[in-house]
UniProtKB/Swiss-Prot annotation:
Lineage per the UniProt record: Bacteria, Pseudomonadati, Pseudomonadota, Gammaproteobacteria, Legionellales
Cofactor(s) required, per the database record: FAD
Functional summary from the UniProt entry: NAD-binding protein involved in the addition of a carboxymethylaminomethyl (cmnm) group at the wobble position (U34) of certain tRNAs, forming tRNA-cmnm(5)s(2)U34.
Pfam families: GIDA, GIDA_C_1st, SAM_GIDA_C
Biological processes per GO annotation: tRNA methylation; tRNA wobble uridine modification
GO MF terms, alphabetically ordered: flavin adenine dinucleotide binding
Protein family per UniProt: Belongs to the MnmG family.
Protein name: tRNA uridine 5-carboxymethylaminomethyl modification enzyme MnmG
A cellular-component GO term for this protein: cytosol
NCBIfam families: mnmG_gidA
List of residues binding FAD: 14-19
Subunit structure: Homodimer. Heterotetramer of two MnmE and two MnmG subunits.
């Protein structure tokens, strides 16, 4: 083993979406950070679908953005197709999705990494961890080079013990074209972590020049184009292109059913559990046998490549079956497959072995983030990487760790779900996982988190000044609207009654009127006496939403305040649950497995009853551990 002379504060292993966010935020907070990757050219690579956001996922992206992260900005700089999902539904469940040019996206990530002070890149795979005095102290690369740091973040994606399946052909790999991390996987299996296998997959890629687009339904970008980042201005967007929609048919399904003998999933070769919410096409055909078609979205991979991503047909069937079923789909009868679809199995570690900071419970200074914790998706990985990077930097600064609570961010929901409940299948974020959806909207992530990000040191001056100006503009306009009185039978009242068919029987403020569902801010401001309107769309949106949902938001905040005291009550890590009178053996076992840090976390462990929480509370009070 050769030692290097450089000493770092934080070492990040892996350069995917978790690793890049972890490295960037640690360096932004002033930590000397080393990012190790087996190939610098693949930093920030979109290994599967070239898209960012979606239902539940764009909430994570915007929270990352609010805390100074790079993902949303890169999506805006590389986005070639943008849509607002659930646009006709309430603001709590609206989402933004950006189809990205994968080359432009990777270039945006590269540029951020290469221009970040306090961050160094080095191309080497990692084979071993250095543990000194029972805590992380560094890593050893494949050529025996030792790098030292008191904190190490593993963001290794699907590379740990990775095994690729195409039909009955199987070979070791971290993803197509990349080697697996076998030595590191073996090293981690020697440590006291609970380890299992998961599986994910990807569809074949298609040459767009061989697609018959005249047979397909075109889906253009929304206009005006939605922005992913709060700090984007929209001037430098790439050229926008359309996606296209087609669907499978009975012939497709027959080909797949007849080809199941070539499926490693259905022949028992694959042991890992696949993603429930992104199943392979063969899994869909078997599970939903009554369906005679499934929708496909044909999504361009970039502006300067003919390759197309057929979203909806992830598969590990043999290549000849892939070719046959693709050719049975309308518009794809003569298409050329450029890359086969495949499944990949990999190691993941039970996230209940992590603290909410994402530091491992058994090895201080060692953090896990991304698919190693059982999640699926770029956005979920990036969110974990950000929190791991923040907490590694805070540890170096000898400051307390920080993770947002469930009532503060979807990131908090994600990490609490993982560290409290664990997962036995790839975990994906949905808005339905959050109890306080109306508070945790994608439109207000900056208002929820940017001040905290500034306190932590991960939001730079430019973003902070932009945020302060926006917040002041919102507050100033709200005060103006509250002071504007509209009297019955006045000229303004008559204009409002005529425009909105709303009878004004008493005096109202302009803010009162915005609480009515029939009236919105831009339309109200078209009445000359009530203007001028604020022109910034994001400010106008906040004024509208905050006015209309004020009552609901006040109720949710009051509910959170009522629960806060007991939810945040600390449980000492040394607590012996055998000494808590009245707990069943099952409850004791679950508490010992998870080792919750607060009563709130304990209450969310599956199988822990309200009665058990009451017994815990009595015990803590008896031991004078609860005020």
């Amino acid at each position: 083993m050769q030692s290097t002379s450089q000493q770092f504060d934080v070492i990040v292993v892996g350069g995917g979406h978790a690793g890049t966010e972890a490295a960037l935020v640690a360096a932004r907070m002033g930590a000397r950070t080393l990012l190790l990757t087996h190939n610098i050219e693949t930093l920030g690579q979109m290994s599967c679908n070239p898209a960012i956001g979606g239902i539940g996922k764009s909430h994570l992206v915007k929270e990352i953005d609010a805390l100074g992260g790079i993902m949303a900005l890169a999506a805006d700089q590389a986005g070639i197709h943008f849509r607002t999902l659930n646009a006709r539904k309430g603001p709590a469940v609206r989402a933004t999705r950006a189809q990205a040019d994968r080359v432009l996206y990777k270039a945006a990530i590269h540029h951020a990494l290469e221009n970040q002070p306090h961050l160094w890149l080095f191309q080497q795979g990692v084979d071993d961890l250095i543990i000194q005095n029972n805590r992380a102290a560094g890593v050893v690369t494949q050529m025996g080079l030792a790098f030292y740091a008191p904190t190490v973040i593993l963001t290794v994606g699907t590379f740990l013990g990775g095994k690729i399946h195409i039909g009955m052909n199987h070979y070791r790999g971290g993803r197509a074209g990349d080697p697996p991390a076998l030595a590191l996987a073996e090293r981690l299996r020697e440590m006291p972590f609970r380890v299992e296998r998961l599986k994910t997959g990807t569809p074949p890629r298609i040459d767009g020049r061989t697609i018959n687009y005249s047979q397909l339904i075109e889906q253009p970008s929304d206009q005006p184009l939605p922005l992913m980042s709060y700090w984007s201005h929209g001037e430098d967007r790439p050229r926008q292109v359309s996606c296209f929609i087609t669907q499978t048919n009975e012939k497709t399904h027959d080909i797949i059913r007849n080809g199941l003998k070539t499926s490693p999933l259905f022949s028992g070769v694959i042991e890992g559990v696949g993603p429930r919410y992104c199943p392979s096409i063969e899994d869909k055909i078997v599970r939903f046998a009554d369906r005679n078609s499934h929708q496909l979205f044909l999504e361009p991979e970039g502006l300067n490549t003919p390759e197309v991503y057929p979203n909806g047909v992830s598969t590990s069937l043999s290549f000849d079956v892939q070719l046959d079923f693709i050719h049975s789909i309308k518009g794809l009868e003569k298409c050329h497959i450029t890359r086969p679809g495949y499944a990949i199995e990999y190691d993941y570690f039970d996230p209940r072995d992590l603290k909410p900071s994402l530091e491992t419970k058994y090895v201080p200074g060692l953090y896990f983030a991304g698919q190693i914790n059982g999640t699926t998706g770029y956005e979920e990985a990036a969110a974990q990487g950000l929190i791991a990077g923040i907490n590694a930097a805070l540890q170096i600064q000898e400051r307390a760790p920080w993770t947002p609570a469930r009532d503060e961010a979807y990131i908090g929901v994600l990490i609490d779900d993982l560290t409290t409940r664990g997962t036995n299948e790839p975990y994906r974020m949905f808005t339905s996982r959050a109890e306080y959806r109306l508070l945790l909207r994608q439109d207000n992530a900056d208002l929820r988190l940017t001040e905290k990000g500034r306190d932590l040191g991960c939001v730079d001056d430019e973003r902070w000044n932009f945020f302060v100006k926006k917040k002041e503009t919102i507050e100033k306009e709200q005060q103006r609207l509250k002071k504007q009185r509209i009297w019955p039978k006045s000229t303004v009242a008559k204009a409002i009654e005529s425009r909105f068919q709303q009878l004004l029987e008493r005096d109202y403020s302009a803010m009162d009127l915005l609480r009515r569902p029939e009236i919105n801010y831009p339309a109200l401001m078209q009445i000359e006496e009530l203007g001028p309107a604020v022109l910034e769309p994001s400010v106008a949106e906040q004024i509208d939403i905050q006015a209309k949902y004020e009552g609901y938001l006040t109720h949710q905040l009051a509910e959170i305040a009522r629960q806060k005291k007991y939810q945040t009550a600390q449980i000492p890590s040394s607590l012996d649950y055998n000494q808590v009178t009245g707990l069943s053996n099952e409850v004791r076992q679950k508490l010992n497995e998870t080792k919750p840090t607060t009563l709130g976390q304990a209450s969310r462990i599956p199988g822990i009853t309200p009665a058990a929480i009451s017994l815990l509370l009595v015990h803590l009070k008896k031991k004078e551990l609860y005020p």
